[in-house]
Swiss-Prot record:
Acetyl-CoA carboxylase is a heterohexamer composed of biotin carboxyl carrier protein (AccB), biotin carboxylase (AccC) and two subunits each of ACCase subunit alpha (AccA) and ACCase subunit beta (AccD). PANTHER family: ACETYL-COENZYME A CARBOXYLASE CARBOXYL TRANSFERASE SUBUNIT ALPHA, ACETYL-COENZYME A CARBOXYLASE CARBOXYL TRANSFERASE SUBUNIT ALPHA, CHLOROPLASTIC. Residues 40-293 form the CoA carboxyltransferase C-terminal domain. It comes from Rhizobium leguminosarum bv. trifolii (strain WSM2304). Belongs to the AccA family. Pathway: Lipid metabolism; malonyl-CoA biosynthesis; malonyl-CoA from acetyl-CoA: step 1/1. Gene3D superfamilies: 2-enoyl-CoA Hydratase, Chain A, domain 1 (3.90.226.10). PROSITE patterns: COA_CT_CTER. It catalyses: N(6)-carboxybiotinyl-L-lysyl-[protein] + acetyl-CoA = N(6)-biotinyl-L-lysyl-[protein] + malonyl-CoA. It is an enzyme of class 2 (transferase). GO terms for biological process: fatty acid biosynthetic process; malonyl-CoA biosynthetic process. This is Acetyl-coenzyme A carboxylase carboxyl transferase subunit alpha.
Length: 317
């Protein structure tokens, strides 16, 4: 069953009519609904084009959070072969919000790290809705250290509203863990490619996203805080999230123009949730091109370029 966003009502109405006509044709074979269904399908496509060609930042935020949008586990199943997950931080516990491990990407050994939100009540609770605790970031550090030791390129897939802000997480050193993970990303002497596949929220995202190349899916978002959080702080009114989203410059187009990201990966018509296989394949192509481009560079070059990239970003914004 498709989950429709509020602004997709014209699409849901048309697709609802198509479902009704198909059901009618099934119940009574003497009724031919083929032509009408064809006309409605054309109108559906036109409605999707019209709506998705002029999404505002708040609508893009909703698309980035769509429950049927492909998550890390979907990319891992399709993009990688022999994915072997790593568990635990060897200090406190396991954190399923961060998924990390070794894999093959188009025949090449790589290290993989990303956030997983889950797609139903059970898995969302298991993965803490994609909000990592300190042990998750320390697990990410483990895989980054391993990648650096064995010369494995790192691929990170970012999808989090932010690091978990609970008391226990703070007591166990959340800020330190995020800082160490960011430092490790900046310090490895291997290629590091990061892709924001949904939400890129605050330091919780940056901790695994300081790559040589950083990309965003067309309808993903990347920001220092959620629009609701910004509205609550600025105006003490979370209902002004739409206004905050516009002012914060959180879309892929905004961040590309500001020089924060290196490129935008186009999504299928209607968003990644309408054709997950297509967007996952496109993401794989972009990652492969980025790794190929960096293949001849030395470890020192890669590290220095990455550090300089983010230093320049801080100076120029």
């Amino acid at each position: 069953m498709h989950n429709y966003l509020d602004f997709e009502k014209p699409i849901s109405d048309l697709e609802g009519k198509i479902i009704e006509l198909k059901k009618l044709a099934t119940e009574d074979e003497s009724i031919d609904t083929t032509d009408e269904i064809g006309r409605l399908e054309v109108r559906v496509r036109e409605a999707i084009v019209e709506i998705y060609s002029k999404l505002n930042p708040w609508q893009k935020t909703q698309v980035a959070r769509h429950p049927q949008r492909p998550h890390f586990v979907d990319y891992a199943k399709t993009l990688f072969q022999e994915f072997t997950p790593l568990a635990g931080d060897r200090k406190f516990s396991e954190d399923a919000a961060i998924q990390a491990g070794l894999a093959r990407f188009r025949g090449q050994p790589v290290a993989v790290v990303g956030q997983e939100k889950g797609n139903d009540t059970k898995t969302r609770l298991k993965h803490n809705f994609g909000s990592p605790r300190p042990e998750g970031y320390r697990k990410a550090i483990r895989i980054l250290e391993m990648a650096d030791r064995f010369g494995l390129p790192v691929i990170s897939l970012v999808d989090t509203a932010g690091a978990y802000p609970g008391v226990g997480a703070e007591e166990r050193g959340q800020a330190e863990a995020i800082a160490r993970s960011t430092e490790m990303c900046l310090g490895v002497k291997v290629p590091l490619v990061s892709v924001v596949i949904g939400e890129g929220g605050s330091g919780g995202a940056i901790a695994i996203a300081t790559g040589n190349k950083v990309y965003m899916l067309e309808h993903s978002i990347y920001s220092v805080i959620s629009p609701e959080g910004a509205a609550s702080i600025l105006w003490r009114d979370s209902t002004r999230a739409r206004e905050a989203a516009t002012n914060m410059k959180i879309t892929a187009e905004d961040l590309k123009s500001l020089g924060v990201i290196d490129g935008i990966i186009s999504e299928p018509l209607g968003g990644a949730h309408r054709d997950p296989d297509s967007v996952i394949a496109a993401t794989g192509d972009v990652i492969a091109n980025a790794l190929g481009e960096m293949a001849s560079r030395s470890g020192e070059q890669l590290r220095n370029e990455r550090r300089q990239k983010f230093l320049n970003m801080g100076r120029n914004l």
